């Protein structure tokens, strides 16, 4: 029960993030392609929460949602150990999605993680803790962290932390990386892909390659929009057991060409409707016109200001932040605050399936001055801006969320 409540909170957080970024005049905006991983951010905040206490911990929990601290810790642990655990290996040919989910902690060699924190992040979140020397070997430490992210995302996210992301006063960095590559349960025939018009938010249009199919599809019609579910192949049994997870992409297509902002506002204000609309997509319906664009997009941001604007302030403030459960007591430990939250996502959708990757890094510093029912035949022509989600359907967690406003652009 507590897991289901935490999943509802994670879905609501996904929509808050996407809605906020879509409205932002800088670093995104309603006329830009967007892709974020709410699950990656959730995992990084769980690592941060494990080292927080007092009002700082309370604010992190409140940001994650009303299910509460134990529920969100349980969700983060379940995702790391079960739902997105990397259980592939040599000779593993089950055919399901390839999934990697990794947590990491890098602490300056002059400091020491508290034993309780190290134990929790290792046992509950499968986080690898590594000492690095930010003070004496800064560039080597940054390179080591970036190589970890590149490896964990199968090379899709490179040079993640910029040169100015860490300095000699950096005490620690917390990280999450995830990678997903899955084939569609029912692949598109590339011979049926053809260029057509995609209508842009500014009233213009571009030519884009559209995938099409005459097969029945999982589509539901709601007030003002339609939802398409494209399941990924689950694969068979491996090593004597089932994969225990099921992934799908959901495309939310507004009825009106310029209806994406209104649809986003509606779904952000009622995330329960989002959950219900996806849960109801269990029956296929015959389709008339059916077109979905191929697209590749990437998005990178320092999410610190977004998190502040959404109510998570204390971890960034000195005095105020209490992250004293992370490292052993010292004058430096009492001054640790979050200086930046770097986040990057990559999503590619084509006839075969989807490849996606995400990285989140919480960088610390030492504090000083603060910073409706379906019809019998349904048309689904995604020739104008739409929203998408990639979810793990058995838990319901939102792994990726984004909007496509121009499939011919990668940003």
Swiss-Prot record:
Provide the Gene Ontology terms for cellular component. Answer: extracellular space
- GO terms for MF: serine-type endopeptidase inhibitor activity
Q: Keywords, A to Z?
A: Protease inhibitor, Serine protease inhibitor
Spell out the residues of the site Reactive bond: 367-368
Instruction: Decide whether keyword Acetylation is in the record.
Output: no
Report the InterPro entries cross-referenced here: Serpin_CS (IPR023795), Serpin_dom (IPR023796), Serpin_fam (IPR000215), Serpin_sf (IPR036186), Serpin_sf_1 (IPR042178), Serpin_sf_2 (IPR042185)
Give the matching Pfam families. Answer: Serpin
Q: Tell me the protein family, please.
A: Belongs to the serpin family.
Record comment regarding domains:
The reactive center loop (RCL) extends out from the body of the protein and directs binding to the target protease. The protease cleaves the serpin at the reactive site within the RCL, establishing a covalent linkage between the carboxyl group of the serpin reactive site and the serine hydroxyl of the protease. The resulting inactive serpin-protease complex is highly stable.
How is this protein named in the record? Answer: Serpin-Z1
Name its species: Oryza sativa subsp. japonica (Rice)
